[in-house]
């Protein structure tokens, strides 16, 4: 079976971890293809156990699945080992986790530069997580990065880190007045860490393509969301990689024709963390309600997420940019007990109406949402397991979102648990 891509269709935090966990039992492989530990996935098992993952694919919680950290990911060795230890301490088998030899390593100087740069920028800062993700991707593009495979050759590794530190220490000391990092200490720490994960390093491209040739199912799991994509997002308030569907092939080493389904994960309302324009953002009691009822606290940052009504403009944009075939709508249960539920169907910018994403961030920042008021429902829907179990007004809301987004809503989340899901059609169905 060809590959299936899971895409965040908004600004991240849509519930991708739950979806990967739900579908993982039907896949042989789960691959993380971009980002680093700047994003978090929360998975609630049927037992009620709650797991938070930042770097390791969500499929690690499903027995029998091989999990891959792909070449498009930037790997913080300390975070990797800490996350592995945390899983193993709770009885999770991590033996089937593999790491691409071509993934880049996130180094101490990346974190140091990221943090000091954000402080230096003041009120002009992007709002990064401060975990060094951007600087690591900068080094990758500048061809001065350290790759996972480099730890297999300590001599060559030392030369590469030495060359990098000659420049990084100049930046830290002469520009930011910070202390220089010690070469020997950086190398020694990394080699000690590498002893604990070097057995996982392999040519994951070869393995994934062989698996697809054998008819196995591969889930490609993105981090963040479409509007945080460095090319297609609300630049410059974006991440440093490509969470969109195009990045899935690039960050895993499979060809784009291998992709069978693009499943967009869409929250029933909209949230965002950090700086940047957000047309439907709420600053009233409705925003407070969504944040409290939806437990909208960032898994990685601990920051409260900004909350707003559903924005069909960005949903249509995500459908177009990713070629989304199906949607998984999450957190519909959060909207219960609202008298009306507004949906943004377009923007008004300088007196002109549009139903498409503006091409400049200044236009998006001053966009006034055009709302369509939909009737709310009061019933508790957390126990619904069939579409017909939902109140009529909740069904109407889903169908209207489906129409506006431009792709069918195949599944609906009505709670955080794996079993709190309504399946309208099989997203892994054959399309031939």
Curated annotation (Swiss-Prot):
Any one of the GO CC terms: cytoplasm
Binding site for substrate: 299-305
UniProt keyword annotation of Metal-binding present: yes
Cofactor(s) needed: Mg(2+)
Positions that bind Mg(2+): 13, 40
Gene Ontology molecular-function annotations: adenylosuccinate synthase activity; GTP binding; magnesium ion binding
Source species: Mycobacterium leprae (strain TN)
PANTHER family, alphabetized: ADENYLOSUCCINATE SYNTHETASE
Residues at which IMP binds: 13-16, 38-41, 129, 143, 224, 239, 303
Listed pathway(s): Purine metabolism; AMP biosynthesis via de novo pathway; AMP from IMP: step 1/2
Main location: cytoplasm
Disulfide bonds: none
Name used for this protein in its record: Adenylosuccinate synthetase
Function statement: Plays an important role in the de novo pathway of purine nucleotide biosynthesis. Catalyzes the first committed step in the biosynthesis of AMP from IMP.
Gene that this polypeptide is encoded by: purA
Catalytic reaction equation(s): IMP + L-aspartate + GTP = N(6)-(1,2-dicarboxyethyl)-AMP + GDP + phosphate + 2 H(+)
Domain of life: Bacteria
Record-stated family: Belongs to the adenylosuccinate synthetase family.
Enzyme class: ligase
């Amino acid at each position: 079976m060809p590959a299936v891509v899971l895409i965040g269709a908004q600004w991240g935090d849509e519930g991708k971890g739950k979806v990967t966990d739900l579908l993982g039992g039907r896949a042989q492989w789960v691959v993380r293809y971009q980002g680093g530990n700047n994003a978090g996935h929360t998975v609630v098992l049927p037992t009620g156990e709650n797991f938070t993952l930042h770097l390791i694919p969500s499929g690690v919680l499903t027995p029998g699945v091989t999990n891959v950290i792909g070449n498009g990911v930037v790997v913080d060795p300390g975070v990797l080992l800490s996350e592995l230890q945390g899983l193993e301490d709770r009885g999770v088998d991590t033996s089937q986790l593999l790491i691409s030899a071509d993934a880049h390593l996130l180094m101490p100087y990346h974190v140091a530069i990221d943090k000091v740069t954000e402080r230096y920028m003041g009120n002009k800062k992007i709002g990064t997580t401060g975990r060094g993700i951007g600087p690591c991707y900068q080094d990758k593009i500048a061809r001065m990065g350290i790759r996972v495979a480099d730890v297999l050759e300590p001599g060559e590794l030392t030369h590469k880190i030495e060359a990098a530190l000659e420049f990084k220490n100049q930046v830290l000391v002469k520009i930011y007045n910070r202390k220089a990092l010690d070469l020997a200490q950086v190398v020694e720490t990394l080699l000690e860490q590498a002893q604990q994960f070097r057995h996982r390093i392999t040519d994951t491209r070869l393995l994934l393509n062989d698996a697809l040739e054998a008819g196995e199912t591969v889930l490609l799991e993105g981090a963040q969301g479409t509007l945080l994509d460095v090319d297609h997002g609300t630049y410059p308030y974006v991440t440093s990689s490509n969470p969109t569907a195009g990045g899935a092939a690039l960050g895993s080493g499979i060809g784009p024709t291998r992709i069978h389904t693009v499943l967009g994960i869409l929250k029933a309302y909209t949230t965002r963390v950090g700086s940047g324009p957000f047309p439907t953002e709420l600053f009233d009691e409705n925003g407070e309600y969504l944040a409290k009822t939806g437990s909208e606290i960032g898994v990685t940052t601990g920051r409260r997420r900004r909350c707003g009504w559903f924005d069909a403009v960005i949903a249509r944009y995500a459908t177009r940019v990713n070629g989304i075939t199906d949607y998984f709508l999450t957190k519909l249960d959060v909207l219960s007990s609202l008298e009306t539920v507004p949906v943004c169907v377009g923007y008004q910018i300088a007196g002109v109406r549009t139903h498409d994403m503006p091409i400049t961030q200044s236009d998006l920042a001053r966009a006034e949402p055009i709302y369509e008021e939909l009737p709310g429902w009061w019933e508790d829907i957390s126990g619904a397991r069939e579409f017909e179990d939902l109140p009529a007004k909740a069904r109407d809301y889903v169908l209207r979102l489906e129409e506006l987004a431009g792709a069918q809503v195949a599944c609906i989340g009505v709670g955080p648990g794996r079993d709190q899901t309504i399946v309208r059609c099989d997203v892994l169905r054959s399309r031939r």
